[in-house]
């Protein structure tokens, strides 16, 4: 006759593994690796309010010092991935730290036009729904950023 329930010893092993996983998960929450929002030093001279609205919706969470996260994005190890992603995004282009000269808009505009920004996973499950741009909005944003970032040193040159 086949036994459907694991032996008592096997159950203990499974419970020990689950308990260890819960303890490790709890301990990694103590690693202080979160997204910070330093002060905005200078935004670029936006060509229009529409361009800024589209950029805020589609770009600012990773490319500015005004990052908004959901509560579960503060739970490790998700927080580790989000923080690295935001740091990399800000290093490439940061709308909150633009200087009066330098920089080019080429890379930013190209990634918007080719559809790689904002990345698809950013809007999974209806999250960040305002970042789901239509083709027309994508074109408006790309054109507006081309005009806005020309000569603005926000990083991420082309």
Where are these regions (language model features)?
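N-terminal Lys/Arg-rich, disordered targeting/topogenic segments
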Residues: 1-9
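N-terminal membrane topogenic signal
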Residues: 8-16
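Hydrophobic membrane-insertion alpha-helices, especially the h-region
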Residues: 15-32
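Electrostatic cytochrome c docking/interface patches
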Residues: 34-55
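The canonical Cys-X-X-Cys-His
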Residues: 55-67, 117, 141
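Short cysteine/histidine-rich zinc-coordinating motifs and their immediately flanking basic loops
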Residues: 71-77
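Extracytoplasmic electron-transfer domains, predominantly the class I c-type cytochrome c fold
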Residues: 80-127
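C-terminal capping alpha-helices of c-type cytochrome domains
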Residues: 126-155
